[in-house]
Amino acid sequence: MHFYHLTIITKDFDKSLKFYTEFVGLNVNRYEDVPDKHKLAMLAEHGEDTQIEIVHYNAPFTAETKGITVCFACSDVESMHKKAVDMGLNPSEIRSPDPKLHYFYVYDPDHISIEFKQED
């Protein structure tokens, strides 16, 4: 058994799709647009099984997202931080609780906490 995907119910599908593809750098593995029902995209890094599914329901739908953090490992946390600043995403400062660990947080369009971490 392995972790397959995390679903994020989004209020603004296009804004979330842009965040996860242009900022995070994920690829769209599957896209579905069912008029009067929903839009859905399955996103992952090239060649990876674990995915993030973003869904927007056309009918009223509420979801509570407090307490959720999604973490991405990256090879250059400073570059990701600069990209977040350049895109106006207002990231936290880079934190380094020990010399081999560096991370920061940014919120996605639905205010889900996204962490980017680099371990040397």
Show where each model-derived region lies.
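Helix N-cap motif at beta-to-alpha junctions
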Residues: 12-13, 74-78
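Short glycine-enriched loop/turn motifs at secondary-structure junctions
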Residues: 1-2, 62-67, 97-98
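Short amphipathic alpha-helices within nucleic acid-binding modules
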Residues: 19, 78-83
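Vicinal oxygen chelate
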Residues: 31, 81-120
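N-terminal beta-strand motif that seeds the catalytic metal site of vicinal oxygen chelate
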Residues: 1-17, 68-70, 120
